[in-house]
């Protein structure tokens, strides 16, 4: 059901105060010619394989995202990462220096989703309500990937969280516009 691209409002904004989407993290160098390994935070492979503009920002220092050209990229299935070539990164020491750097796109560069698909950033903070009783259960705090995606819901008035498979049988209504999700939890999942 959900699709990831992490909205990063805490990243520095440029003078137009736009938001950025974090699509991956550079986790190391690959080879001697400046390629980098990118761990994806996006379900859209074109973020890493199609040439075009991307932005880099260091997680350790407050900085403005820097524009960079993505030249090419490929998926390494057995490792679950992308190997990407960036413009003007031609040597291993340059690519090693980028370790930990976040790869970004502009928030207005979101692909259109199919019905029943949602951006993870749109789900975080949404109020969760019991479909039958209309009682507030809590709010979405995260999404865990497993066989099915699992909504992590922080229960109302507590720090306890529960995991609920994000499938239509258990999550019949998702209304992003009103920031409300209705669930039909299995008996015993939510403490009384």
UniProtKB/Swiss-Prot annotation:
GO cellular component, one term: ribosome
Gene3D superfamilies linked: PRC-barrel domain, RimM
Record GO biological process: ribosomal small subunit biogenesis; rRNA processing
Tree of life domain: Bacteria
Domain PRC barrel per the UniProt entry, residue ranges: 115-189
Residue ranges the record marks as coiled coil: none
Keywords on record: Chaperone, Cytoplasm, Ribosome biogenesis, rRNA processing
Record's keyword annotation contains Zinc: no
Subcellular location(s) per record: Cytoplasm
Pfam hit, one: RimM
GO molecular function, one term: ribosome binding
Subunit (UniProt): Binds ribosomal protein uS19.
Family, as annotated: Belongs to the RimM family.
Function as written in the Swiss-Prot or TrEMBL entry: An accessory protein needed during the final step in the assembly of 30S ribosomal subunit, possibly for assembly of the head region. Essential for efficient processing of 16S rRNA. May be needed both before and after RbfA during the maturation of 16S rRNA. It has affinity for free ribosomal 30S subunits but not for 70S ribosomes.
HAMAP family on file: Ribosome_mat_RimM (MF_00014)
Domain-related comment: The PRC barrel domain binds ribosomal protein uS19.
Record's protein name: Ribosome maturation factor RimM
């Amino acid at each position: 059901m959900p699709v990831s691209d992490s909205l990063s409002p805490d990243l520095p904004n440029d003078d137009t105060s736009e938001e950025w989407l974090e699509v991956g993290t550079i986790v190391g160098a690959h080879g001697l010619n400046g390629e980098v390994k990118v761990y994806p935070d996006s379900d859209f492979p074109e973020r890493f394989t199609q040439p075009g503009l991307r932005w880099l920002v260091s997680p350790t220092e407050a900085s403005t995202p820097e524009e960079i050209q993505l030249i090419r990229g490929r998926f390494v299935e057995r490792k679950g990462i992308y190997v990407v070539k960036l413009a003007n990164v031609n040597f291993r020491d340059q690519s090693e220096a980028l370790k930990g750097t976040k790869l970004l796109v502009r928030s207005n560069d979101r692909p259109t989703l199919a019905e029943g698909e949602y951006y993870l950033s749109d789900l975080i903070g949404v109020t969760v309500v019991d479909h039958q009783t209309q009682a507030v259960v809590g709010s979405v705090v995260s999404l865990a990937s497993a066989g099915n995606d699992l909504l992590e819901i922080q229960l109302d008035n507590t720090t306890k969280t529960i995991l609920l498979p994000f499938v239509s049988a258990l999550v019949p209504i998702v209304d992003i516009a009103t920031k409300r999700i209705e669930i039909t939890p299995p008996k015993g999942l939510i403490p009384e």
